[in-house]
């Protein structure tokens, strides 16, 4: 189960091209070495880095741009003897009740956040892939950086801290959600970029409303993505940054219209087949190649 909050803003999308290859190569060489940390790919797509919570070091953190709020495994909260309080959050297609706690400090790479409120859950029950993780780091903490660069070829993440003097006190409470504009059979759709998802999830009712004549083949009901139950189908005419292709999608009924307005689903970063992704939280843009 992935626990989500609300997306309060979206970002524009830019694509890497051969003309700016020299510029994008500078992203890594220009980075100060302490800002670059290694990561491992868990399950072929989850980005896992080492982090610290309080005095607990060597913890496994998963960086997840599809989660608005960070989630800490319950055993970590128990080891820190933290007081829990219940609260409701939105999770893909419904509201769920989860516990929250105040953590003294959280650190991954050069990023250190103090006195932060985060969700607490039993991650092993949420996902087989993230069950070994100690925390899922969502946009609330990722957006305390100015930029996040994910380099799949070298298995490095570059985290550039913000200028604390330029960041408003309330900015941490308003994480940005990065969206990707794609074409489905000639129609524009908008998908949330999700490093914590492998494939493509579409809200079927929103897609059919946007594209009444949408063509789907090989539909199979009773499919599961974690705890989510929906169906799978082959979607022809899907285009991101290249020729159209047929893709397999997971279809789910969307939330009510005032939740995630204008969002048609989620795009797992593995679907981009990118070597490098850069998220710029200050300019509110994203690039990949």
Residues of each region from the PLM?
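Bacterial N-terminal signal peptides
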Residues: 5-15
């Amino acid at each position: 189960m992935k626990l989500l909050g609300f997306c309060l803003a979206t970002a524009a999308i830019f694509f890497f091209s051969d003309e700016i290859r020299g510029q994008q190569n500078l992203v890594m060489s220009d980075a100060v070495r302490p800002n670059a940390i290694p990561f491992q790919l868990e399950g072929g797509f989850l980005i896992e880095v080492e982090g610290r919570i309080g005095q607990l070091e060597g913890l496994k953190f998963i960086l997840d741009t599809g989660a608005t709020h960070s989630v800490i495994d319950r055993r970590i909260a128990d080891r820190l003897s933290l007081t829990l309080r219940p609260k409701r959050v939105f999770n893909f297609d419904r509201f769920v009740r989860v516990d929250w706690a105040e953590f003294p400090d959280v650190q991954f790479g050069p990023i250190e956040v103090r006195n932060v409120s985060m969700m607490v859950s039993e991650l092993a029950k949420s996902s087989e892939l993230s069950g070994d993780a100690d925390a899922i780091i969502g946009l609330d903490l990722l957006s305390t950086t100015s930029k996040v660069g994910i380099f799949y070829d070298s298995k490095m993440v570059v985290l550039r801290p913000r200028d604390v003097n330029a960041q408003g006190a309330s900015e941490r409470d308003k994480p940005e959600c990065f969206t990707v504009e794609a074409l489905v059979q000639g129609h524009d759709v908008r998908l949330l970029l999700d490093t914590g998802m492998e494939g493509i999830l579409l809200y079927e009712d929103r897609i059919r409303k946007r594209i009444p004549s949408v063509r789907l083949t090989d539909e199979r009901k009773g499919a599961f993505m974690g705890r989510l139950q929906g169906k799978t189908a082959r979607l022809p005419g899907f285009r991101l940054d290249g020729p159209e292709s047929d893709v397999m999608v997971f279809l789910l009924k969307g939330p009510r219209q005032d939740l995630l307005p204008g969002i048609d689903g989620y795009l797992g970063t593995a679907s981009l087949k990118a070597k490098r992704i850069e998220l710029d939280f200050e300019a509110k843009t994203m690039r990949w190649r």
